[in-house]
Design a protein with these regions (language model features):
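Rossmann-like NAD(P)(H) cofactor-binding subdomain of soluble oxidoreductases
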Residues: 1-52
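Helix-loop-beta segment of a Rossmann-like dinucleotide-binding subdomain
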Residues: 7-18, 56-69, 119-126, 171-181
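Generic preference for well-ordered secondary structure
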Residues: 15, 24, 41, 51, ...
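Residues that cap or flank secondary-structure elements
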Residues: 19-20, 73, 135, 186
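Internal alpha-helical scaffold of NAD(P)-dependent oxidoreductase catalytic cores
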Residues: 32-105, 110, 114-155
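NAD(P)-dependent Rossmann-like dehydrogenase/reductase catalytic/cofactor-binding core
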Residues: 125, 133-203
């Protein structure tokens, strides 16, 4: 969830952030320097799941794992990974611009994940609360401003993105699950990365 450590590798945003690391995700660029972003292949994970106990995962819905190279090419290694996932019964589309999908998911993560963790509500319960929905819309509007500044195309509306999330019954996003389990929260990749980009680009 959130923006990956390799996000600006060959990103072509025409901003000063191209080919730099995100401090909020990768402090001092340690992952960038150690793993090298050329080794990265991006993946947007859509299934809604819950860890019931170690080794036991409850799958609520979803079977799509969108894949993409940071440079947007459809490489042989990308095709191979996609083929393996498809042969396993999953959907694994190969994307030339995975970053758009990363932001569509981030759109929900930065709002629903955080407010579910703060309120303890499931996604469908959030959909029934006008006050929370109003706050979610405002958060998504701010996220969209930042994304568009670095070339992201939001091909669905805020209302449709909200409908998609709140249609999932009885599910709490991973941030709320982590909070309830006493695990570290993924706040920096989900929220901190957006704030960092906004500050660096004076948005």
């Amino acid at each position: 969830n959130g923006l990956p450590w390799w996000y600006f590798h060959e990103a072509k945003t025409q901003t000063k952030l191209d080919n730099t690391h995100l401090e909020s995700v990768d402090p001092k660029g340690k992952i960038w320097k150690t793993l090298n972003p050329n080794s990265a292949i991006g993946c947007v994970v859509y299934p809604a799941c819950e860890i019931l106990e170690p080794g036991i995962i409850k799958h609520t819905e979803g079977d799509r794992f969108s894949l993409g190279e940071p440079n947007g090419m459809i490489s042989e290694r990308l095709k191979e990974i996609s083929s393996i996932l498809i042969d396993s019964g999953l959907k694994a589309p190969q994307k030339k611009n995975l970053r758009d999908e990363i932001w569509i998911k981030l759109w929900g993560n930065c709002s629903f994940n955080i407010l579910s963790a703060l309120t303890g509500s499931t996604l469908d319960e959030i959909g029934e609360n006008p006050a929370i929905l109003n706050l979610i819309k405002k958060m998504m509007e701010e996220c969209k401003l930042v994304g568009e500044e670095i070339g992201i195309k939001f091909r669905v509306s805020i209302d449709d993105r909200i409908k998609g999330a709140t249609s999932i019954q009885g599910h709490k996003p991973s941030t709320a699950q982590d909070l309830e389990a006493g695990k570290p929260l993924e706040i920096d990749p989900i929220i901190g990365s957006i704030i960092e980009i906004g500050k660096k680009l004076n948005i």
